[in-house]
Amino acid sequence: MNPLVSIILTSYNKPNSVGKAIESVINQLYTHWELFIMDDNSNTETVQTIMKYLKNPKIHYFNSHIEESERYKTTRYATLINKAIPKTKGKYICYLTDDNIYLPNRLKTMVHLLERRKDVDIVYSEQLVKILSNNRKKINQIVRKTQGIQYKAAGRVDHCSVMHTRKIVNEVYKKYGGYWNDDPQFWINGDAAFWKRLNEFKPFYPIPQILDVTWKFPESFQRLYTNVPKTIPNGTLVRGLSNEIFVIDQQTRRRISKKMLGTLNYYEERVVKIPDPFLFKYEEGEPVDEEIFTYPEKIPNQRLIKGKNSPNIYYLQNHKKYRIKNLHVFKQYHFKQNDIVILDEEIVAKIPESNQIIDLLTNTGATLPDGTLFKCYSNYYLSYHNRLHPIQKDVINRLNLSVQQAVNMPTSILSHYSKGEPFKWVKKSMYVK
């Protein structure tokens, strides 16, 4: 009798592709399988797509109902896999994601090798990677080739390209008290951490043919993760996989409507798409809504404001208004007239006043506007709390900031400001030590 294969599909908010992933299992030439769809509390559209397939008795569905505020605390797909493995009954186990499909001969080919070679516990195949644009058009593709027998598979093999025995995963559990390591440090390479565990017992044997296809959408975690700094600067507009927009204000995320974006002269093209775990690690603050005109302390920081009948222009930071001394200073910091928010005089009057923002070159240690990008030779800095935080150029571009708008700062002035923690992206090594 053909052995049972257990497939674990992890799903989160990909209604346009999760159905294709499920159908790729249904269309397998090898028919003795069970599919566990582990959904991470996806949106309604995704869940409705999944529900269409649940009449099939071989398909099982579980929803995590995870709270958004808890989402960042573990590597969610690893957590879901750990919950699924004890539910499975197959002799062999493999994995699938909602942006990946199996080719029809995938299970048949892998089972054949594992059944023929009793000394082999893990097999892996080649994978076709299709990189897609926002309108789902292919802009590039590559093939991840097999590279012989892998004694160190971490970072070299995608988890949708693997099948392993139940026997070896039980060995992992005996040693570690669990299966996949779902520590949040492994968001980008959870499979690599698990492969390291598997490699302690057995190597990965290659099947040198393409057996699965993965799509790299603009909203794929790996693409959204790239060049996002560990700390997102205050004043940044962000969104996750949903269409809701937030402004990072004093390291909280504040929901803001498209109407209020226009009212406060934010620009939607400046919104930075980030992975949901990065978004939800920021506590949600008060929404940016009409109440800001009643309670001006709720106006987001890093806005230019002025009263309707006053010539004075102010910059908001730390919930105080800093008067910009004159037009020369306004231009020196590359402020723009179109960014000024016109408010009733009584609202402006209620905001506490602090120092002036004066000529950068005439007063060492002068108050710097928060969130201003500075350049000194080839180095870039963002200012916060009168400290200069180094920032990588790739991070600048990722945050939709403009290097062309950077304010030049002479070395003689730079030396008068202390340095803060850098805004940098540290690429997680795909090789787990």
Task: Identify the function of each model-found stretch.
Residues S125, T146-N227:
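Conserved nucleotide-sugar donor-binding catalytic segment
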Residues I101, N105-K138:
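Conserved donor NDP-sugar-binding/catalytic core segment of glycosyltransferases
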Residues D40, L96-D98:
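Active-site acidic Asp-centered loop
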Residues M1-I26:
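N-proximal low-complexity "stem/linker" segments adjacent to membrane-targeting elements
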Residues I93:
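Short aromatic/hydrophobic "clamp" motif used to bind/position activated sugar donors
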Residues I22-S69:
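Acidic donor-binding segment of Leloir-type glycosyltransferases
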Residues V228-K433:
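Short, surface-exposed polybasic-aromatic patches that bind anionic ligands, especially phosphate groups
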Residues I66-T88:
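Glycine-rich, basic loop-to-helix element that forms the pyrophosphate-binding segment
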